[in-house]
């Protein structure tokens, strides 16, 4: 029981630390809409594999390009992985009110929508979306152990 309390306290401390890192979000067409960390029976990628995923939503009524943006993820303070969304792929242009799904599988060689990091639900997970000017666009922190397998952490409705 004490280990669980300590784990919860550490998770809360990490979330507070990440939330107070002083970066101000810029207004953007694109937002982090949904995150699924433990994918055992959910969407499959083009290779038939199930991995954690991050959904980015274009909340505007015009197309928005993710090329040059960055997805960042951290499971512990001071240790942030960064995935640079490549330029030159027409699929990074997200149509109005549509989604782009990124696989957090640590396999960027599989294509534009496969990140160089994996997510672990046993610790608090912070995910940030940065624009091509390296300004924070949106962020979310998923508390440790908050989700069961195949349960996503999402906005109440798209872009809400």
Predicted regions and their residues:
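Bacterial N-terminal signal peptides that target proteins for export
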Residues: 1-9
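Bacterial N-terminal signal peptides
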Residues: 9-17
């Amino acid at each position: 029981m004490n280990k669980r309390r300590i784990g919860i306290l550490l998770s809360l401390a990490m979330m507070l630390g990440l939330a107070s890192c002083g970066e101000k979000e810029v207004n953007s067409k694109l937002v982090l809409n949904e995150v699924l960390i433990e994918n055992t029976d959910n969407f499959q990628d083009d290779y038939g594999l199930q991995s954690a995923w991050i959904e980015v939503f274009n909340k505007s009524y015009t197309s928005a390009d993710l090329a040059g943006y960055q997805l960042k993820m951290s499971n512990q303070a001071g240790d942030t992985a960064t995935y640079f969304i490549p330029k030159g792929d027409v699929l990074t242009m997200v149509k109005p009110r549509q989604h782009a799904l990124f696989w957090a599988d640590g396999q960027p060689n599989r294509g534009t929508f496969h990140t160089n990091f994996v997510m672990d639900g046993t610790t608090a997970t912070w995910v940030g979306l940065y624009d091509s000017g390296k300004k924070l666009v949106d962020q979310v922190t998923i508390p440790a152990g908050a989700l069961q397998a195949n349960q996503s952490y999402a906005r109440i409705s798209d872009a809400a």
